[in-house]
Amino acid sequence: MDILPHEKQIHEYIKTIEHLKKQSQDNPIFDVEIQKLEQKLDSLKQHVYSELTPWQRIMICRHPSRPHAVDFIRHLSESFVELAGDRSYREDHAIVGGLAKIGGIKCVVIGQEKGFDTESRVYRNFGMLNPEGFRKALRLMQMAEKFQLPIISLLDTPGAYPGLEAEERGQGWAIARNLREMMRINTPIIITIIGEGCSGGALGMGIGDVIGMLEHAYYSVISPEGCASILWKDASKNVEAASALKLNAEDLLNLKIIDSIIKEPLGGAHHDPHITYQNVKQFLVEQLHILRRIPSQILLEQRYLKFRQMGEFLEG
């Protein structure tokens, strides 16, 4: 497992404990020392993970072993039938979507997938959507509306693909169209930010009735590196930018950008993915039961007001 900078001391404790346990298999002389070290390790973990900086949490969010959209879909749904294509240009492999059943409830699930190794990351375009990806997502959402199925959108992208070809095919227009259409799609929409939620790539699939966010995910108009490059002309100022952007879950909840924080295991989702899947599934099933009871007209009005009120402030 990749060790993050703030976890090095924790890893040293773990290595020492493992070494002593091997030594104590034939001689229990180390048992008391092992017990003391394990207690110190627990205290150290609580201390380190309770005082994470915004940048450290971004490193957790970007950890190579963090569960991706395909993992969540596989573990959350009792059944899943993938659907492909935008019916216009081509398939975008950065989007995985289809018909699913979660907690016994039929729905449409759409996730942004970055890939887990070099080959799959290239295949998935590192989770950066092209215009056809946004069109594919919208096609699935309109199908969900037609059959009155709730929609679950899993966000995990460093941003929409900024290539020339994507711009020529109408990248900005595709995102803008999704913003407009998602605001008036007449079926419940639950947004869940499972990793990186960056820029228009996330926003183009991020309009919904409820927005949940994993504890160490982030949601921002730009990456810290991009912000630092623009404001300070120095990408190495990413730590300062991460703090200034207010992109972590607690800040976004206080600013009323998101509605709920979904707990992760101590140290991040990659330390115990199954606990993370359980927590996300519990959140989704609870919200599905709540939203399905709200009349459609009220649901649309509340969705519109939710986003209109973001960023409002009163002058003293």
From Swiss-Prot:
It comes from the Bacteria. It is an enzyme of class 2 (transferase). The keyword S-adenosyl-L-methionine does not apply. GO terms for biological process: fatty acid biosynthetic process; malonyl-CoA biosynthetic process. Keywords: ATP-binding, Cytoplasm, Fatty acid biosynthesis, Fatty acid metabolism, Lipid biosynthesis, Lipid metabolism, Nucleotide-binding, Transferase. Pathway: Lipid metabolism; malonyl-CoA biosynthesis; malonyl-CoA from acetyl-CoA: step 1/1. It is found in: Cytoplasm. Pfam families: ACCA (PF03255). PROSITE patterns: COA_CT_CTER. Component of the acetyl coenzyme A carboxylase (ACC) complex. First, biotin carboxylase catalyzes the carboxylation of biotin on its carrier protein (BCCP) and then the CO(2) group is transferred by the carboxyltransferase to acetyl-CoA to form malonyl-CoA. The keyword Ligase does not apply. Belongs to the AccA family. SUPFAM superfamilies: ClpP/crotonase. One of its GO terms (cellular component) is acetyl-CoA carboxylase complex. One of its GO terms (molecular function) is carboxyl- or carbamoyltransferase activity. Residues 36-290 form the CoA carboxyltransferase C-terminal domain. Its main location: cytoplasm. Its EC number is 2.1.3.15. It catalyses: N(6)-carboxybiotinyl-L-lysyl-[protein] + acetyl-CoA = N(6)-biotinyl-L-lysyl-[protein] + malonyl-CoA. InterPro entries: Acetyl_CoA_COase_a_su, ClpP/crotonase-like_dom_sf, COA_CT_C. This is Acetyl-coenzyme A carboxylase carboxyl transferase subunit alpha. Acetyl-CoA carboxylase is a heterohexamer composed of biotin carboxyl carrier protein (AccB), biotin carboxylase (AccC) and two subunits each of ACCase subunit alpha (AccA) and ACCase subunit beta (AccD).
